A protein has these predicted regions:
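Class I SAM-dependent methyltransferase SAM/SAH-binding core
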Residues: 2-55
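C-terminal alpha-helical "lid/dimerization" subdomain adjacent to the S-adenosyl-L-methionine
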Residues: 109-147, 157
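Conserved S-adenosyl-L-methionine
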Residues: 152-162
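Conserved class I S-adenosyl-L-methionine
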Residues: 87, 94-121
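A conserved beta-strand element that flanks and buttresses the S-adenosyl-L-methionine
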Residues: 67
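Short catalytic micro-motifs in class I SAM-dependent methyltransferases
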Residues: 70-74
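A short, conserved alpha-helix within the catalytic core of class I
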Residues: 75-92, 99
Length: 167
């Protein structure tokens, strides 16, 4: 089985759980925005490709499974999120997309309660005051927003803190 993973070089320890646990790491392909040096040091038998998850550099149906773990909220607004889903569906026979649940009261990136529910200008001001200006770039999704990104049938599992979309 071949498995592609957009967002393969994250700074968070949970980002690489697949590479750490999958029994056949030589069958994985990870994709990230960075040059992949840290990733290659940690996972030398897993292929790493530098690229954009919204414009994947792979052929149609190149992978049995595409798994995107908490990437979609970082790619930009809706048009970019739709592009990520479209590309994942193009290159993978099955697709799994996870994302933090917008309707969970504590935002997982900042660990701030309720701020992400404020109107955007107020939330952005709160992120600045909390010295987390990077959080303004996150575009969180709820179950209906995640479902709307998929052009066809998709299963959405609400795990309370996070959502999983699977085809």
């Amino acid at each position: 089985m071949s498995l592609g993973e957009p967002g393969g070089e994250g700074g968070c320890t949970t980002h690489n759980y697949l590479e750490e646990a999958y029994p056949w790491p030589e069958r994985l392909t990870a994709l990230g925005l960075h040059d992949g040096a840290r990733f290659r040091d940690r996972f030398p038998v897993t292929e790493y490709v530098q690229g954009d998850a919204c414009a994947l550099p792979f052929a149609d149906c190149a992978f049995d499974v595409v798994h995107s773990n908490a990437v979609i909220e970082h790619v930009g607004r809706r048009d970019r999120q739709e592009a990520l889903v479209r590309e994942a569906l193009r290159v993978g026979r099955r697709v799994f997309v996870t994302t933090p649940n917008r309707w969970f009261p504590v935002e997982v990136h900042t660990r701030l309660p309720l701020v992400h529910w404020l109107p955007e200008p107020l939330a952005h001001r709160a992120y600045d005051l909390a010295r987390m200006p990077w959080a303004k770039q996150n575009h969180l999704l709820g179950p209906s927003g995640l479902r709307a990104l998929f052009p066809g049938p998709v299963r959405i599992d609400n795990l309370w803190l996070s959502l999983v979309a699977s085809t």
